[in-house]
From Swiss-Prot:
One cellular component (GO) term of this entry: plasma membrane
Gene3D superfamilies xrefs: NADH:ubiquinone/plastoquinone oxidoreductase, chain 3
EC number in record: 7.1.1.-
Chain's role: NDH-1 shuttles electrons from NADH, via FMN and iron-sulfur (Fe-S) centers, to quinones in the respiratory chain. The immediate electron acceptor for the enzyme in this species is believed to be ubiquinone. Couples the redox reaction to proton translocation (for every two electrons transferred, four hydrogen ions are translocated across the cytoplasmic membrane), and thus conserves the redox energy in a proton gradient.
The name this protein goes by in its record: NADH-quinone oxidoreductase subunit A
Enzymatic reactions: a quinone + NADH + 5 H(+)(in) = a quinol + NAD(+) + 4 H(+)(out)
Keywords on record: Cell inner membrane, Cell membrane, Membrane, NAD, Quinone, Translocase, Transmembrane, Transmembrane helix, Transport, Ubiquinone
Enzyme class: translocase
Highest rank taxon of the organism: Bacteria
Length: 145
């Protein structure tokens, strides 16, 4: 078999794969659209829980501070992933990798110190209001009432 025939066979196999995957997606979406129930009632957005009628509303408003905590979790989770990858390859990285990891940790710690200084981690509104009135970090008075 020549090289051209092998390449053509690979392209055909890939084309058949793409067409079958696309066809399966179209089939599933069309089947769901045609066979699915259409409810225009008010209870369409109500979750179904074992046949029990819901009491109250399921729409809760969360404070933005919960999203802040979630973002901190994501940031420090990604930091942990980078440090784990560095720790598994510490012998290959050597001192250069150690210095780079130290710089990475120091940058993240500087960001954390900055967030603590501006009051981004405070859950009480009094300190946040006081810091907003005070101005930038360098101009914050020590004793303010």
């Amino acid at each position: 078999m020549s090289i051209t025939t092998e390449i053509t066979a690979h392209y055909w196999a890939f084309a058949v794969f793409l067409l079958s995957a696309l066809g399966l997606c179209v089939f599933m979406l069309t089947g769901g659209f045609l066979l699915g129930a259409r409810a225009r009632a008010r209870s369409k957005n109500v979750p179904f829980e074992s046949g029990i009628d819901p009491v109250g509303t399921a729409r809760l408003r969360l404070s933005a501070k919960f999203y802040l905590v979630a973002m901190f979790f994501v940031i420090f989770d990604v930091e942990t992933l980078y440090l784990y990858a560095w720790a598994t390859a510490i012998r290959e990285a050597g001192w250069v990798g150690f210095i780079e990891a130290t710089i990475f940790i120091l940058i993240l710690l500087a960001g954390l110190v900055y967030l603590v200084r501006i009051g981004a981690l405070d859950w009480t509104p009094e300190r946040s209001r006081r810091l907003r009135r005070a101005g930038p970090i360098g101009e914050t008075p020590r004793h303010q009432e």
